[in-house]
Structure formats: C-alpha cells, structure tokens
UniProtKB/Swiss-Prot annotation:
Transmembrane segment boundaries: 47-67, 75-95, 110-130, 167-187
This protein's name: DNA translocase FtsK
Protein's organism: Clostridium acetobutylicum (strain ATCC 824 / DSM 792 / JCM 1419 / IAM 19013 / LMG 5710 / NBRC 13948 / NRRL B-527 / VKM B-1787 / 2291 / W)
Entry remark concerning the domains of this protein: Consists of an N-terminal domain, which is sufficient for the localization to the septal ring and is required for cell division, followed by a linker domain, and a C-terminal domain, which forms the translocation motor involved in chromosome segregation. The C-terminal domain can be further subdivided into alpha, beta and gamma subdomains. The alpha and beta subdomains form the DNA pump, and the gamma subdomain is a regulatory subdomain.
Subunit structure: Homohexamer. Forms a ring that surrounds DNA.
Gene this protein is translated from: ftsK
Family the entry assigns: Belongs to the FtsK/SpoIIIE/SftA family.
Entry's Gene Ontology BP terms: cell division; chromosome segregation
Amino acid sequence: MVTIKINNNVHIILEVIYLPRNKQYKKNKQDKISETTLNSDIAGISIFAFGAFAAVSMFFTSFTGIIGNGMKKLLFTLVGIGAYIFPILLMFIGVCYLIKKGKITFSKRFYGVNIIIINTLMLIQMQKLSLYYNGNILDGIKKIYESSDTFHGGVISYILDVPIYKLFGKGYFVLFITLYIISFLLVSEKSAGEIIRENLKKKPLKKTKPSVDETKTMDYENDNKDKDETLAKKISSKIKIVDFMKNEGNVDSNKGQALEEIAVYDSAEKNENESKVIGAELEDAIGQTSSNNSDITYEFPPISLLNVNETSKLKKSDKKELLSSAEKLTETLNSFGVDAKVIQVSKGPSVTRYELQPSAGVKVSKIINLSDDIALNLAASGVRIEAPIPGKSAIGIEVPNKDLTAVFLSEVIQSETFSNSKSNLAFALGKDIGGNCVVTDLTKMPHLLIAGATGSGKSVCINTLIISLLYKCAPTDVKLLMIDPKVVELSVYNGIPHLLIPVVTNPKKAAGALNWAVNEMTKRYKLFAENNVRNIEGYNDLYTKNKVESKLPWIVIIIDELADLMMVCPNDVEDYIGRLAQMARAAGMHLVIATQRPSVDVITGVIKANIPSRISFAVSSQIDSRTILDTSGAEKLLGKGDMLFNPVGESKPIRIQGAFINEEEVERVVGFIRNESTETQYKEEIIEQINSNVSKSEGDEDELLEEALKIIIETKQASTSLIQRKLRIGYNRAARIMDQLEEKGYISAKDGTKPRNILVDKDDL
C-alpha cells in the first residue's frame, strides 16, 4: 500500500498488487492464443461462407439476389469456366483455417493442382484469343465482360496470354507443356530421374554379352542339371500313366533312360467287351420297359442311331512323350527351388493332368505362382493348377493336349455308370480327366445353371441332356417344357411325346409358360397335402398301391437363353424362376437354364442363390468365371466341350470333357421317336392359358399412350421426364408408357446416355 500526500487535507492511497513474473507471462500468452484462435475461426467461417454463397450463386442464381448475380458475373469475367472451381477452393481454404487454426501450410501437391488449373484456363483462353484480341487489350476485356459464352479462361488468363502470344507466337505450346510437366512433378512428389528409373526397371534391356556373374550362374545350372539327371537314373521312380482310352501295355526304355517299374494301366479290350454286353443289356431293359406298359406305345431309340468313337488307342510314342513332359515339369520346378515329383499322369480327352507330390516344407502357393513358367517350359498355351486335388494329397497341373479327342455320347450311354443309374432324370455329361464316364442325376441337383461363351459347347450339352432323357425315360415318366428364344436351337424336338407343349419361342409366351409352371407346382403341393405325402416319390408310391388314380410325371423345364428373356420381361422371369428354384424340387419339377452372357444382370442374386449346381464352359474373363462358379478357372478352359462342373455338395469344380452329339444324330433319334410313337398330344389347356396371359398383357395399354406419342412427335424429344412433366403423371407410369412406345416401334431402344430416336412422324399417324 502506498500513500501519496498532495497537501495537508488530501491524501491518495494506492494499493498495488504484484504478480509473479512467470504467471503474468502465461496469462498474456493464453490471451494471445485465444485471440488468435478466435480470429482464425472467424476468418475460416467467413471464407467458407463466402465460398458457399459463391457456389449457390453459380448454380442457383435466382436464390441469391443482386449480389449473387453480380458475383456470378464477376467470377465468369475474371476466371471464366474456372468460376465453378473457385467456390470449392474457397470452401477448402475455409475448412483448413478452422482445422489448422489459421496456420495453413499448403503442400507441393496443392500448388501443383493450382498450376494445372491456371495452365488449363490459360490454354482454353489462348484457343479463343483471336475472338477477343484485336490489338487493344481493353477491347478484349470489354468483349469478355459482355460475352454470354462462359467457356473461356477469363480476363486474368487473357491478360497473361496476350504477352505470351506476342513473345512466343505458336510456340506457346512448349511453355504450357513445360508447366504441365512441372505441375505433375509437384503432384507426384517425385523427381524426373526417379520416374525415368522406374520405367526403365519395367523394361529390361537386351544384353548382347553375358556378364561374368551370369556365366557362373549358367555353369552352375548346367552342373545342377547333370546332377539331377544322374539322380533320376539312380532313383527308382514309379509314374502311373492313366489314359482315358484305358490302354494296357509296357513301355520300352527310351535311349537308356532308366525309369523302372512304370505302371501303365490298359483295359481297352475289356471295356469294349463290357460296352457290348452293357449295350445289349440296355436294349433288353428298354424292350422290357416298353412291353410292361401296355398303354404306352413309346419305343426307346436304339444305340445304333448314335455315332461310335473310332479314335485309335494311345501309342507307345505318346506315352514316351508324356514321360518326357513329366521330366520337364520336374526339372522346371527344381530350377525354381521347388522339390516335387510326378506320381501319376492322367491323359484325358482334352487335357493331361500331372499329379505332383511336393516334399515336406514346400508351400502350395509357390507352385501355383509358377503357372506361367510351367506353361513356357512345356510349350503349352496355358496351364490350370488344381491345388490340392480333392481326396488326394497331390497337386494337379492340367496341360492342354496337342490334339483334342472327342467324347461321343454313345460311349457314356453304353457305360456301366449310365445303365446302373436308377434315376429317371440321370443324364450323360462326358468323361473326366481319368477317363471315367460322368453321369449325374438332375433330381439331386435339383436345378442346373449352364453358362459359357458362344461356341463353347452349351447347346451340345443341352442336346446331350435331352437325348439322355429320351434314352432313359418314357413320356409317362418325364415331361419336357422347352423355352427357346433363339428359335432354332430346340425346335427340332417338336413332335416328340415328351413335350407338354410345342417349343416356346416367343419371350412373352415364355413368361406365361413359367407362370403355368408355378401354378402347376402349387397344384401339386395341394395334392400332396390332401394325400399326406411330402414329395412326388411318395405320391407315385400311392399310385403303385392303387390309392390314387393317376401318376405324376417329372417335369424338366429347359431354358436355352436366359439373357433374351431377361431383356423382355426381367421382373416376371426372375420371380417365376426364383419361386420354382426354391420350391419345385419336391413337386418333381426341375430347371435347366443356359445363358451365354454370365453377367450379374442376367444371373441375378435370386437365381444364383437358388441354383447351386452349375456348369461353366469357356468364358472370356475371370469375372465371368466368378459370376458362374464363385471361383476362377473357367477363363482357362479350351472350349469345344471343355467344362467345369460344380454339383451341389462339392467343394471344388470337376473338369470334364463334355459328350459330343451332332445335329444329324439328334435328327436321327428324334425322327425315330416320331415315327415309332403315337401322335403327340399337347396339353391344350396349357397353350390356352399361355395365350390368354399374353393377350391380356398386350391389351394393357395406357390410356395416355396416344397423347404421349403426339407430345414426343411435336417436341421431337422422347424421354420419361418429358412425358412426366407434360402429362403431369408419376415417374413409374411415364416409364411404362415409354416401354409401350418402344414395344410398338414408335421410338428406339435406350442406348446409354444417348437420346432415343423417334421412328414415326405426323404422316404416319
């Protein structure tokens, strides 16, 4: 406390409070920090608000008043087309102010992006310089201000471009390219030398003379090769060769190579004798079946209508070639440090599988990654690696054969596997790599999806399925419902007694046929409930016990091209197929669907989830393979019937060479059935129901269709939004009107973002 005496009567008392020096400094610093933060927040919010207002002014001028209009005009005058980027840049800077609290340090990438923008605006303005510059810069500025065209660089770019053009002339491109290169270097944050070195690493240089280190490596590899050959001669290796023709015989050693105890299995003569016996038994069984049913006049076609495979058996030279390829494969793997040996070679119709047994400690992934190197050393177009082979502790390397051998349908039908199958819906697929005939049962699938590129073998596979059913089942046991939007594929089967109705070729009628199938499925389930049975087998057992009047046949629904149906009526087709796939199994109805376009808009999630069994032929990409099989591999197939079969319950797909049947064989079998059977009687009630559904759908025209047609002819525009605005209707109704106009041929189909073409005029009306 301090007392100050001014005179005898007046005294001033001052009380001074002393603070420690460090506390006083901290208080001042905190005040400054809070003040700086507040200022940066105010600045950031102001800049962001200004940028947001500028953005609204650019896109919604009517909402921002006089200031917004003036700002839009000013921005277009100053920076031209860059006016659309300017508000975004301002809002970005405002956000940075708020986050960084006013301490903004922009990176080189930010400056690089800005140089690209400025350089682009200058380049745009340079292209239009002759429109604005006539020798007087001010006149050009006035023209830019008064111009209604916004596609220019603005006054700033104009002022910069005029001296550049006067100094450099047409050589201004060099300057702009230089600025682009500099900006790209700033954005990439790499030097030009680094970029050049990275590109040089990707392109190996040709070396005319090997270096000393390379010479040592080559000598070392040659020594290793000699050691491997000596080791191979010492080790007694057992390589089992399995030919799909099942030939027996021993192979002589080739030029002193000591491959001891090579087990070669051959049973061609035995198989030929067995096939003759089985064929005779099959024909006897067919005769008994047709004679036991007195009411049926169906006569099964004989095996002689099908072509016989006359392919020669595997020669000794071919076996020597297989052994040589097995040695090359082992040497290739050894050169990459993979210790493995070939334990079996299986020669299939289209590919040969080498079964490898890797040593302990060798990773499977290491062998998979060497697929390209294996194909190079074996001079193959490509290899497929199956790791591991299901049921074996081995890795399969599938190499395409030089000469493809066809598998004829007669071979599989005469096989013991087909004749012993008791199912009515068993059909022949082909042969696997080991030469075993593959016969599958449609009742266990219970539905099948077939996909593949054009010419890969889908139609042949469907023909083998149908012909197999004709050899296996009478019309009272199995009925067929065929849908063929391509018209020419399945029409040959018209007239056989197995068909419920003639082959459906109209896509709209196809939707009606599927609708009938759904209704039939519902009727069968009601029938099962009335008789206390769960499925078609239980109901037919009641028929054998004379407890019901009629027997229910199995129904196989075959769709040859799903993509065409999905284009015409996708919603209905997807719903019907989804319901059938979910519920039709117990009712004795099975789907076989084929498509050559395995995209997700054709094979939808609903269809894919309810059809677990799939066959994939050769496809063009790995994406298509994953769409069909949920795994890759189909893109490496060879075509011509080479397929991957993934039945329900199997963890991995099986590679099969599909059975082949040509058009002449199909016509012979179908012609025999037509001639020997009674006249086919189609279900008229099904045909009437389908036709009524089609006529009903065609008669559902919108009442505003004619008015919409007049509008698009007068305006010369055809769009859903136009009809929606003019007629004041909802989007769904306007879209349906557009679909009806397209169906009637008044407008063209939709082609991406391009406008539809109007195909009629006033005279046509």
